[in-house]
Structures are given as structure tokens and as C-alpha cells.
Amino acid sequence: MKDVAFGQYYPAKSFVHNMDARVKILAVIAYIVAVFLVQSVTTAQGVAFQFLGFGACLFFVLIATLCARVPFGKVLKSIKGIMFFIVLSAILQIFFNASGNVLAKWSFITITDVGLLNAGFLVARISLIVLGASLLTLTTSPVEIADGIESLMYPLKFIKFPVHEFALIMSIALRFIPTLLDETDRIIKAQKARGADFDSGNILKRVKALMPVLIPLLISSFRRADELADAMDSRCYSGSKVRTKYKKMRSTWRDLVATVAIAGLICGVVALNVTGFLAVVVLL
């Protein structure tokens, strides 16, 4: 459970850590848009431009990680945490995509070249999105994320949307992700000390073995929620009141540099898509 990096803040003094939280949130959204803008093309020329687009997104993440002074292993843990989902998605693409040239066939399972390309495309897209999202949570504290979301959603207050309450919910959710992961790890170790086996057997047996973990975790979650509610109540917390900020967010030259960089990434991906499309049209 400690392999999941999403939601865990890594304190450091770096270019990215000192950026405005609002700019970081918008930059991650723009980065995800750039990843989705990379088109899926099944021709050889189109695939080359497609992976150039993914390469540009990966280069952007690597530069951002270096500027954030976050260990690469810490960022890669986010991929390890969802490896099962990534592998399952790739298998479904490979075995159940009938379009393209058939490379192998067993019973109802057909492996085609298009299926392999789509599987690689899907793995690259999911991995890049998770890397970018985890970099946001690693370099931005839950309080900063909540303040950033509240500031960005401020115009919704005019239509009576509970912006502050929504930001508070997001902040608490992000704050409790690492707490619940640590609690899960502690319960699993306690169960293993009592002779529980979570590593052997098929997937159904492993899921069944996790039942003694889920029930204590659920009880612990409710207990922590009650403790947090009591703590907020004892401090007379009220989300409806106008609240001041200890640290006000201000944009600096770092945010301008990041904005130019993400705009350049999106323009580059769009240019690669257009070039790849034109190359395919010319060949046809």
C-alpha cells in the first residue's frame, strides 16, 4: 500500500513547490488535455508521430520532476500502484480487438497488430496522466490544493454553489489518502502476524482474504471521521463564514514560465497531430 504515491505530499524547496497552486492545478489539467490530444493512428507513419507526442509529454514530466526535486522513484510509485489496472486494460485491448492484420489466433482470442498498437497507446496514455497527477500532489500540500480549487471556483459562488465546502471535502479526501494507506498497511501486517496469507492462491482467494482487512479499515475510517468532526466542532468551524488566509496565493515569474511551457507542449502536440495526419493523407 505504500507504493501508492498519489495524495502523498513530498516537502522540498524547489521551483515547482514555490509555484502558485492555482497555476499548478491548471497546468496539470492542460497537461492531461495534451495527453488526450495525442491521436491514435494505426499506420506506421502515424504511429511515429503519435509516440513523438507521447515523448514530448514524457519529456515535460521529466523536466517538471527535476525542477520539483522529487526522487524519480517516488513519482514512479504512482504507476506501480495501478499496475494491475494498466495490465488488465492492455490485455483487453490485445485479446479482444479484431481489427487489423491477424498475428495469432486461439479459439475466440485474436491478436492483431492494431490491438498491440492500441494496447501500447493506452498504457502510455494512462501512465503519463498518472505521472502528471501524482506530481501535483507530491509538490502541493492538501491545504494549498484546497485553496487553489476554492480560488479557481470562486465565480460559482454567484450561482450559490458551495465552493468552500467543496474545496474542504477535496482537501480532507486528499489528506486522508496516505493516512488510510498507512492504516491498511498496519492492519495487513497485524493479520499476517496472526497467520493470514494474502499472497497465495488465485485472485478470488486473495480478494476473500482481504475481508478481515476491509472491515477494520471501514471501522477505523468512521472513527477518524468522527474525531475530525468533533475537532472541527470544538473549534466552532463554520464554512459559511468569510475566512481569512494565513498565506495568500500570488503568481510570480515561475508561474509565467510554467504557463509558457505547458502552452508550448500543447502547441507541439497539435503540430505533431497535424503533421502526422498530413503524412497519412499524402501516403494514401
Predicted regions and their residues:
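Transmembrane alpha-helix interface motif
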Residues: M1-F49, G53, L58-V61, Y154, ...
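Short, flexible active-site loop motifs that bind/organize anionic cofactors or intermediates
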Residues: S14, T65, W106, L135, ...
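Amphipathic alpha-helical protein-protein interaction surfaces
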Residues: A21, A68-P71, S141, I145, ...
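Structural signal for the C-terminal ends of transmembrane alpha-helices
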Residues: L37-V38, T65-V70
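Small-residue-enriched core segments of transmembrane alpha-helices in multipass membrane transport
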Residues: G55-L66, I79-V87
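Interfacial helix-loop-helix linkers and transmembrane-helix boundary segments
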Residues: P71-I79
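Juxtamembrane/interface alpha-helical elements of multi-pass membrane proteins
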Residues: S78-A196
